[in-house]
Amino acid sequence: MAAAAENLRTEEIQLNMGPQHPSTHGVYRALLTLDGEKVVGVENIIGYLHRGIEKLAEDRTYTQVIPYTDRLDYLAGMLNNLGYVQTVEKLLGLEVPERAEYLRVIMAELSRLASHMVMVASMALDLSGWTAWFPPFRERERILDLFEMTCGSRLTVSYMRIGGVAADIPPGFLPALESFLNDLPRMIAEMNGLITGNEIFKARCQGVGKIDLETALAYGITGPNLRACGLPFDLRKARPYSIYDRFDFDIPTLNNGDSYDRFVIRLLEMEQSARIIRQAMEQLPDGPVQAKVPRVLKLPRGEVYHQIEGAKGILGFYLVSDGGSKPYRLHIHSPSFVNLGALPRISVGGTIQDFVVNIASIDIVLGEVDR
C-alpha cells in the first residue's frame, strides 16, 4: 500500500471563481490553480467594472468630476470627494472656511465607519456568521440616514465642493449623530462577543493569509491592512491634511498580519473615528460652509498630487491642469487596486476555503479597482 501511495499522481485543475460570486465582493474573477483543495496559483482578472472615470474627467469641468468620485469606492463616497476636492484646492491655493473643514472631517470619519462596518459584516457572513451581519448593518443604516438628512443621498453623496461643502448640516443632525455615537460601543461589543472571541472564527482566520511587514511594504499596502502588520502609519497623523492635527486619537496596530488581525483592526479603528467625530462636534465653529469661487473654475497651469487616508488605505489624486476649466489629466491611486495585487501572494499555499477568507479580509471594492 505504501509503495502504491508513492506512485499516486495528482493533477492540477483550474477553477474560475467569479465574476459573479457572492464571496468576490463585486465583479472580480480569480483564476485559481488547485492541487486538490490546495491553492497553487492565483491570477487576478479585473476590468469588469471599468467605466473610464479618469478619461471621462478630461471632458468635465472640475466641479462636474465630483460625482464620479462617489463611484470609486462607493462604500466611502465622502472620503473620495474629500481627496479630489482637496487636490483641486491645493493647486488653486484655496482656503476653506473653518466650519466646512470640521463638517468635512465629520463626514469623512462617518464614511470610514460605514466602510469598516461593511467589511466586518461581510467577512462574518462569508464564514456563515449570519447573526453577526446584522449589528454593523443596523448601525450603518443610521450613518446613511445622516448622509441622506444632509445631502439627500445615501451612497453617491457628492457632498464636498471645491472650497467647502454643498450645504450646512440640518437642525436635527447633531442630536442624531450624538445618539449614534452613544450606541456605537454596543455594536462593537456585540461583534467582539459574536465573532472576535469565537473559536470557530479564530480557527478559520488566525494564521490565514498572513503577510509580514516587509512584504506588505514591498507591495505598497497601506491603511488598516498595513497597520495589521504592526506599522503605525496613518496619513492623518504622519502628514496631517485638513484639520486632523487638531484632534487627539491613536493609531491602533496589531502584529500578526493575518486575516484575523485585518478584521480586528477595523473594529479598533471604529473607536478612533468616533473619538475624532466627538472632538469635531465639540469644536464645530459657526460661519460659512463655502468659500467664494467662480461657477466655472479655471486652474493655473501645473500639476499636483494629493493623498488622504482612505477607508482601505492611501487614496491619491494626481491632477494636471493646462490652464483651462477641465482637467488635462487625472490619475487616481486606489488602495483596493494595490491590496488586490497582494492577494495571490497571501493565498498560494493555502486552501480554497482560505481564499474566501483572504478576499474578505483585504477589503476590496471593485469600483475602486477598475475605475
Swiss-Prot record:
Task: Kindly give the InterPro entries that the UniProt entry links to this protein.
Answer: NADH_Q_OxRdtase_suD, NADH_UbQ_OxRdtase_49kDa_CS, NDH1_su_D/H, NiFe-Hase_large
SUPFAM superfamilies per UniProt: HydB/Nqo4-like (SSF56762)
Q: Kindly state which reaction or reactions the protein catalyses.
A: a quinone + NADH + 5 H(+)(in) = a quinol + NAD(+) + 4 H(+)(out)
Question: Which subcellular locations apply to this protein?
Answer: Cell membrane
Q: Which GO-annotated molecular functions does the record name? A: NAD binding; NADH:ubiquinone reductase (non-electrogenic) activity; quinone binding
A cellular component term from Gene Ontology for this protein is: plasma membrane
EC assignment: 7.1.1.-
Q: Which class of enzymes does this protein belong to?
A: translocase
Tell me the keywords, alphabetical order.
Cell membrane, Membrane, NAD, Quinone, Translocase, Transport
Specify the protein's topology with respect to the membrane.
Peripheral membrane protein
Q: Which Pfam families match?
A: Complex1_49kDa
Asked whether the UniProt record includes Lipoprotein among its keywords, one would answer: no
Tell me the function of this protein: NDH-1 shuttles electrons from NADH, via FMN and iron-sulfur (Fe-S) centers, to quinones in the respiratory chain. The immediate electron acceptor for the enzyme in this species is believed to be a menaquinone. Couples the redox reaction to proton translocation (for every two electrons transferred, four hydrogen ions are translocated across the cytoplasmic membrane), and thus conserves the redox energy in a proton gradient.
State the similarity comment: Belongs to the complex I 49 kDa subunit family.
The record describes its quaternary structure and partners as:
NDH-1 is composed of 14 different subunits. Subunits NuoB, C, D, E, F, and G constitute the peripheral sector of the complex.
This protein is called NADH-quinone oxidoreductase subunit D
Organism expressing this protein natively: Moorella thermoacetica (strain ATCC 39073 / JCM 9320)
Identify the taxonomic lineage of the organism of origin. Bacteria, Bacillati, Bacillota, Clostridia, Moorellales
Q: What gene is this protein translated from?
A: nuoD
